[in-house]
């Protein structure tokens, strides 16, 4: 039996008898430990040898023997808990301790900086698993950030100013409006050791052609080593930014044959995935990264939904609650929570119904009915961005005839959506309308793969907003089901850089196709000793740029 298993058995005994010496029998102990009398005798011998207890046996069946505790179960439990923390076995820690508040405090005390075996380790507490890290698929906000730490594109979009920077390619040029050329760096390696080849770039980009944003790509070639040519059906001013977006990250061409690639992907980025399961994501600095090596050697993201629900609202936590050296960075998101009206629905495609719903479901009405807890994190939205005021308040019209029931759909693992849907249910019930709730996984929501009248979601945009606002929405298949046919004309204007984003957004809002609800306050709780931490528009920070100052003497 392993030492950890023996410790667990001892703790069960200690808890059963409250650490008090007692007279008992082998049979009684067998019932406590759920094993045979013979096995109990073996366990007691090992515990006695370890110096945890003294077992004074009396001969004869049914005779009561003396059990004397020499070690505190709490002390042993604390020792075992520290071992599990050190080994990042958080799920086992929860089973060992049992008390969620106690586990939370233990975890918070270990967040942030750790120095182990000469390595700097950053620990972060998060509220849900990050199970899909495959570029070109439906990615939520935090998955998008992680993918940027693991992969590279031909170009890179600077998170702070939106400027385009070299990445896998060091230079690029538009030879003609329909022909772009990218010059790649040599000797770039994937995390599994193989050198990047031009065929990896070609396969990564051509796999995206079926997607709306990339459908104008005609062909991708490599005329000479370390040169990639991209040919287009129609000009695209934004192509270099598009090839730096998270969907266009470069994968090894054999990615489909790699086991569990969506969960444990292989890229060329500053961090490689070491472990990714339901309770932990561990990424490690890639020593052969072609850029500056990351200063933090390892990032551990501990996933505990039942212990970190508040992080759904408050953001990323890198430090304990009770330290006086916390530093808080906050920003209002570039984006919003919103409602979409499905054009496939007979009710939602009716302008009068959409207008009536938007007049009823105002941000102020939702806030006034919501739990006060949320008011700290929600700011009323009157446009897609905080500085836009496109949703004009109008007088409430009478309810349209025949409107008695609606279906609202949102994605799972987002408790704020539960709160919003409850408030919507109350508002509509007061008007005689029953709201049916439908919860999907994120991929089905992203695809619009369900029958629904209204869809609840959120979007986070990044710099440059002129690129990301349209790109983020247009690449989402759900939007194709909810916006008008004009969207296909808008893509050409956007690619020509003649589509004014404020006007486009105002049109969607005023036509009651896209209904903003809230802007969310993003918060990042850091450590005083951390440097290089600047929160991005996704509520995270670039891991490879962060570092720790030495502890004070």
UniProtKB/Swiss-Prot annotation:
What Gene Ontology molecular-function terms does this entry list?
Answer: DNA binding; peptide transmembrane transporter activity
Q: Which InterPro entries match?
A: SBP_5, SBP_5_dom, SgrR_HTH_N, Tscrpt_reg_SgrR, WH_DNA-bd_sf
Keywords, sorted A to Z: Activator, DNA-binding, Repressor, Transcription, Transcription regulation
The record's DNA-binding region positions are 26-49
An individual GO BP term: negative regulation of DNA-templated transcription
Q: Where is the segment annotated Solute-binding?
A: 163-494
Name the Pfam families on file. Answer: SBP_bac_5, SgrR_N
According to the lineage, what is the superkingdom? Bacteria
Residue ranges occupied by any HTH marR-type domain in the UniProt entry? 1-113
* Keyword Transcription among record annotations: yes
Disulfide cross-links: none
Q: What is the role of the protein in this entry?
A: Activates the small RNA gene sgrS under glucose-phosphate stress conditions as well as yfdZ. Represses its own transcription under both stress and non-stress conditions. Might act as a sensor of the intracellular accumulation of phosphoglucose by binding these molecules in its C-terminal solute-binding domain.
Q: Which HAMAP family match?
A: HTH_type_SgrR
Name assigned to this protein:
HTH-type transcriptional regulator SgrR
Q: Please give the organism.
A: Yersinia pseudotuberculosis serotype I (strain IP32953)
């Amino acid at each position: 039996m392993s030492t950890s298993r023996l410790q667990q058995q001892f703790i069960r005994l200690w808890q059963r008898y409250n650490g008090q010496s007692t007279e008992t029998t082998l049979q009684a102990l067998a019932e406590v430990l759920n094993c045979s009398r013979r096995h109990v005798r073996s366990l007691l011998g090992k515990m006695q040898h370890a110096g945890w207890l003294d077992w004074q046996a009396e001969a004869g069946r049914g005779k009561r023997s003396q059990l004397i505790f020499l070690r505190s179960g709490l002390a042993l439990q604390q020792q075992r808990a520290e071992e599990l923390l050190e080994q990042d076995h958080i799920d086992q820690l929860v089973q060992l301790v049992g008390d969620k508040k106690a586990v939370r405090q233990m975890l918070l005390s270990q967040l942030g900086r750790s120095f182990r075996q000469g390595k700097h380790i950053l620990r972060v507490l998060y509220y849900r698993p990050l199970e899909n890290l495959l570029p070109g698929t439906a990615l939520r906000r935090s998955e998008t950030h992680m993918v940027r730490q693991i992969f590279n594109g031909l170009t890179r979009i600077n998170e702070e100013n939106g400027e385009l920077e070299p990445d896998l390619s060091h230079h690029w040029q538009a030879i003609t409006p329909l022909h772009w050329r990218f010059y790649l760096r040599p000797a770039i390696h994937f995390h599994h050791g193989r050198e990047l080849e031009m065929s990896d770039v070609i396969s990564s980009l051509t796999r995206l052609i079926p997607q709306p944003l990339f459908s104008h790509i005609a062909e991708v070639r490599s005329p000479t080593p370390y040169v990639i040519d991209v040919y287009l059906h129609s000009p695209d001013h934004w192509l270099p930014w598009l090839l730096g977006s998270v969907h266009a990250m470069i994968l090894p061409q054999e990615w489909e044959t790699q086991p569990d690639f969506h969960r444990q992907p292989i890229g060329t980025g500053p961090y490689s995935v070491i472990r990714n399961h339901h309770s932990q994501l561990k990424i490690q600095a890639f020593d052969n990264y072609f850029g500056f090596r990351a200063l933090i050697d390892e990032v551990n993201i501990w996933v505990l939904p039942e212990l970190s629900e508040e992080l759904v609202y408050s953001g990323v936590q890198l430090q304990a609650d009770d330290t006086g050296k916390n530093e808080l960075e906050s920003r209002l998101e570039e984006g919003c929570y919103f409602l979409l009206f499905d054009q496939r629905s007979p009710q939602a495609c009716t302008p009068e119904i959409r207008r009536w719903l938007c007049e009823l479901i105002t941000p102020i009405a939702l806030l006034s009915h919501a739990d006060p807890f949320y008011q700290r994190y929600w700011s009323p939205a009157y446009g897609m961005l905080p500085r836009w005021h496109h949703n004009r308040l109008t007088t409430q019209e009478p309810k349209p005839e025949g409107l008695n029931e609606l279906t609202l759909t949102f994605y799972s693992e987002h408790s704020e959506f539960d709160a919003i849907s409850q408030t919507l249910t109350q508002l509509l019930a007061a008007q005689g309308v029953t709201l049916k709730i439908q919860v999907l996984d994120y991929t089905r929501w992203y695809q619009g793969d369900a029958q629904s009248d209204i869809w609840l979601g959120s979007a986070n945009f990044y710099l440059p907003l002129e690129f990301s606002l349209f790109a983020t929405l247009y690449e989402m298949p759900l939007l194709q089901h909810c916006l008008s046919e004009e969207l296909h004309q808008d893509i050409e204007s956007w690619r020509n850089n003649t589509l004014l984003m404020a006007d486009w957004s105002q049109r969607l809002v005023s036509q009651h196709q896209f209904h903003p609800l809230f802007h969310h306050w993003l918060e990042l709780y850091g450590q005083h000793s951390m440097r290089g931490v600047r929160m991005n528009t996704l509520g995270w920070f670039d891991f490879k740029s962060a570092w720790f100052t030495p502890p004070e003497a």
